[in-house]
């Protein structure tokens, strides 16, 4: 990063725990859990997120390998002027203006905004980064030939752990570092024993989880752990990202127990009866994860577009 870029970036502020209030007005417009306030704060040290307000538009920089932009805006926001300012800033720093986490439904908006300042856009999306979306009724359904795999997995799980149970994290300000949260860390430790840090290409997920707990919001988040007796087996964390969608943002089945991942997702949905869609996130191009997520029959995959302004 050159001196000009460093000078420019001083205008932007690191995302901290106290910034939640600045992001809240945009929560109902969230398309992806990757870029809610909680996700940005949790992954802050890995992606060096920084933000700045441009009128009623919140601009977040993601600084991993290249600098890119995530836009937060409301219905009716006029981003023409914002795009013009960003384009000039990036041009001055000899950088290409690139937006990430753009939904397909937003492409025309970005196209029209770019044209309003005399520019064009190009865009692309990777299957590796696309989120798997499930209609909750279909995800819970065990009937029919297509759901045979779900039934086989659950039957295998019940034979191995007939007394399997689930516990939900009941948050208060005094128990953030004990109770089932410690069991989540234990499951992480088990998972780490069979993986190397070099394979965690986005950084240490356990440390990301620690930061997430700092901003846990009981109104938006649910943490559940599965147990065989007193032994923790797996855990999952869901985040409500809009009025009808919950997204699984952390999930670990350290012992790779057959049927357990689906069972825990299913039990959490059965306790949350006003959700229409479940987002299980991306597969990162890992074939085993792709096979598992397809086996639950997604209703569609939600692409995350990268938009470049030229």
Could you describe each region identified by the protein language model?
Residues 171-231:
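Short, conserved active-site entrance elements at the starts or edges of catalytic domains
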Residues 106-123, 152, 284-301:
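Conserved active-site alpha-helix within GNAT-family acetyltransferase domains
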Residues 116-197:
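Acyltransferase donor/substrate-recognition loop-hinge adjacent to the catalytic core
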Residues 98-100, 167, 277-280:
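Short catalytic-loop micro-motif centered on adjacent basic/acidic residues
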Residues 35-106, 227-255:
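Conserved donor-binding loop and adjoining core beta-sheet/short helix segment
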Residues 220-310:
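Aromatic (often tryptophan-rich) hydrophobic motifs at membrane interfaces
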Residues 2-56, 200-201:
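Amide-forming acyltransferase catalytic core, primarily the GNAT-like/NAT-type
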Residues 96-113, 127-132:
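Short, glycine/charge-rich beta-strand/loop segments that flank catalytic centers
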